[in-house]
Amino acid sequence: MDDWKSRLVIKSMLPHFAMVGNRQEPRKLQESGKKPSWMEEEDLSFLYKSSPGRKHQGTVKRRQEEDHFQFPDMADGGYPNKIKRPCLEDVTLAMGPGAHPSTACAELQVPPLTINPSPAAMGVAGQSLLLENNPMNGNIMGSPFVVPQTTEVGLKGPTVPYYEKINSVPAVDQELQELLEELTKIQDPSPNELDLEKILGTKPEEPLVLDHPQATLSTTPKPSVQMSHLESLASSKEFASSCSQVTGMSLQIPSSSTGISYSIPSTSKQIVSPSSSMAQSKSQVQAMLPVALPPLPVPQWHHAHQLKALAASKQGSATKQQGPTPSWSGLPPPGLSPPYRPVPSPHPPPLPLPPPPPPFSPQSLMVSCMSSNTLSGSTLRGSPNALLSSMTSSSNAALGPAMPYAPEKLPSPALTQQPQFGPQSSILANLMSSTIKTPQGHLMSALPASNPGPSPPYRPEKLSSPGLPQQSFTPQCSLIRSLTPTSNLLSQQQQQQQQQQQANVIFKPISSNSSKTLSMIMQQGMASSSPGATEPFTFGNTKPLSHFVSEPGPQKMPSMPTTSRQPSLLHYLQQPTPTQASSATASSTATATLQLQQQQQQQQQQPDHSSFLLQQMMQQPQRFQRSVASDSMPALPRQGCCHLFAWTSAASSVKPQHQHGNSFTSRQDPQPGDVSPSNITHVDKACKLGEARHPQVSLGRQPPSCQALGSESFLPGSSFAHELARVTSSYSTSEAAPWGSWDPKAWRQVPAPLLPSCDATARGTEIRSYGNDP
């Protein structure tokens, strides 16, 4: 019974500290289905309870309480009363695991180690997961409880000293001390662990320290995460097998969280809240665990597992919750994602890494950052979309919303964020910079960025620019978000955007040159750019688009007559956009113009035909530009290059035109003959070179114009984009309110095809020609 007494003392102590108001936890643990695994041991516990051993337990508990009062006073003065119960229950449990007295002792002793050496403790914590798995496997059901309790005690600063005292208590046998020593030795990171840490590229101390601080901070999230890990481990019996070896160490992990002090019980208890995230954790952690498992020196496995789990959770959980939080996963977002140990970010809901949009909303920025690092590799590996995603990720990192698309977002959070912040705050700057940085994601980034929430379907694209729009411009965000629904098209247009990447790269100078204009455009440039675009849309919201399919020129002609509309748009949008239009129009005009066109089209059809031409260019820039180039706008088929060029030239000319009042029109019309001819020439060349792409771009773009025109479903990809546009429309409408009726739909649809590679070349030329106009 001495062994039992010592165990009871330790266990009762652990519950006292760990219970911290969770005295019912042991019962919960038992009730939570631990009994089945404890049946045998529980039977023993009952025997012990009925046997004089229980008296010993009471005595030991009293002794413990005496000691406990000292420590509990430090942790929680009220524990002594509550502790008795947990102690009894724990003692019962301990008696249950009486078969493993040494294990229980070791576990009890281990927690101090966990508390003292964060790296070693972390290693033990990782092993505690294994230990918990063992309880799950039924290897040491009693021990798991003991371990969780110990963990909880470890969480409490006083508990460690209390453990030490317990160790010094005569009830604690030397056996326990020996086990403790062994555990301590095990805890020391082994060369293998260090190697694993190096390989993982994460400092074991950091994760360990993070985990430990979480435990010290009584980070419930970490316990949840740990529970997830434990569950993952439990699910992965490989770890469970190796766990048995690490039984003593497993105690430390529970120390992370008080509530989770009962690894198994807490598992069921925590599972309630982190069950979903645990499921994710399991899949993620399990996936990672196999990796960490190979080097399974108990301590090493812990480090490897923890690092791996953290890495996996970082990628998965971090992307879901907080990419940046992974390091502190438990600390920064403890409450948000308790389930996720690696990244207990505020989004436990996003169990699936990419799918859950909720995660991005809370603190996707950090997640994006972290995720971008961890996920960027996988996301980028995935496809160009991954690249786009990277951009999106970066923007998402900056933007909480993009979170759902953590994988894609994460890849380029830095890029997108930098573009947002770097080039211009303006949407165009964001679009341009993100697109430029991630050429394929220029419009794509901008579009997806705009609807972090709506664009979940297009995670990669959305991810690319969600952050950008948010940062850059709320209205633009609405447009972008509205465009994001266009992400549907964007998915189709993504390729186009990839082509556009080149154009974006070329276009970047414009945005840089017109960074001021871009900023203004972001504020007003959207309106300014869209005035031209809006004009065409206004001209024939629905018909022009479909008409553009066959005869963009004719519509353009009417739109030119509607030049008067441009003023309306400008008035509506605050004409300041002339200068901004040049830079912003290129990137933002396509998107903003479409929406503005839609809104303004509805609002006004007075703006100058130049604006209308610009919009038409946006709608059918390729055709129209080509027509201008070939002097037969109607004959020219809408082509991405021409369209893009027209749009780009319109954008670059927008400033001059808005200044001249006819920049876009002159592009298409002789008014700004020099600009128009050169632009058309470039566009024509680019269109001719990339004529095949032009249709795509024009299609991608037309959907926006179609939407702006009211025939969103006109284009092939438009129906879905139209739906998205509607959804986003409502979503963007609120955000796009500043722009009035601006139809985000048009925005969404426009961007993707706006910048085909040919268009990029033409646009680049155009930009070079007019990039300095602003």
Swiss-Prot record:
What organism is listed for this UniProt entry? Homo sapiens (Human)
Record's note on what induces expression: By NR5A1.
The entry's protein name is Mastermind-like domain-containing protein 1
Main location (coarse class): nucleus
Stretches for region Disordered = 257-279, 310-365, 386-421, 442-473, 525-609, 656-678, 755-774
Q: Which residues carry this modification: Phosphoserine?
A: 676
Q: Which GO terms describe its biological process?
A: male gonad development; regulation of transcription by RNA polymerase II
Q: Could you say which protein family the record assigns here?
A: Belongs to the mastermind family.
The condition associated with this protein in its record is: Hypospadias 2, X-linked: A common malformation in which the urethra opens on the ventral side of the penis, due to developmental arrest of urethral fusion. The opening can be located glandular, penile, or even more posterior in the scrotum or perineum. Hypospadias is a feature of several syndromic disorders, including the androgen insensitivity syndrome and Opitz syndrome.
